[in-house]
Amino acid sequence: MTEKTQADLDLLIDEGLNAEKGELDLARHELEDDDVKAIFQSDKIKGVTALFLEFNKISDEGIRALLDCENLKHLTALNLFKNEVTDAGVKEIAKSKTLLNLSELVMSDNKVEVEGAQALAESKTLSNLVSLWIGDGLGDEGAQWIAQSKYLTRLNLLSLYRNNIGNAGASALAKSSNLSSLTELNLNWNFIEADGIEAMAKSKTFTNLEQLTLTYNPIGVRGAKAIARSENFKNLKLLDLYE
C-alpha cells in the first residue's frame, strides 16, 4: 500500500467532512495508526461529533491518539467497525474522559474479548451509550459482563453478533435487570440453542424488543416455538431466524 502524504490526508478530511452535521466519514481508506494520528492533529476536524472509521487498519495506538485529541472531545458517535482494536484499546476508551458524551459506539469485528467487555461494563465514561456494537470474541463470559453492567443501562440497541455466545450467555442476558430498555438485539452468528432461547422467551427483560436477529444460531424448532409463544416478544416487528 502506498504511504499517504499529508496532502492525501487533508484531501480525505475535505472529502469526508460534513461540517453542517458535524460528521467526518473516513471509512474504507485503509488508514493506519500513523494516518489517523496526523488527521487528529488537523484543526479541520474541530466541531466533529460523529466519526466514522470503519473498514480501516486502526489498532490500539490509533485509539490512544483519538483519545488525546482535543478536537474530538465532543464526540457522540464513534464507528470503528472492522479494525484491529484489542482489549487494551477498549480499556483506554473505557477510562477516558474524552468520550463522556458518547451515545453510539460501534466496535464489532475488532479483536475484543472478555477483558474488553469487562472494561466496557465497568465504565462510568460510557454510561450515556444508547447503542453498542462489540466483538468479536466475547463468549459467554463477555456477554455476562455486559448483562450485569450497572452503567450500560440506557442501551436501546445491543449487537453481540459473532461472539461465540451460547446458552449461558443468552441466559445471562435474559436475567439482566439492566437491559430492559432494549428495542433492538442482534445475536447473529452465535451458538445459542433452544435452551438459551427459552430463557430469553421467559424473560421480562425483552418486553420492549422490536427487533431480534438470531441468524445462524442452532435454535431448532423448539427454540422457534418458544419465540412464537412468548408474551414477552409480542412487540417484535422484525424477527430473523435464518439458519
Q: Which residues fall in each region the model found?
A:
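Short, solvent-exposed loop/turn at the beta-strand->alpha-helix junction
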Residues: 3-9, 30-37, 57-64, 84-91, ...
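A broad, low-specificity signal for short, low-complexity segments enriched in glycine/proline
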Residues: 10-15, 148-149, 175-176, 188
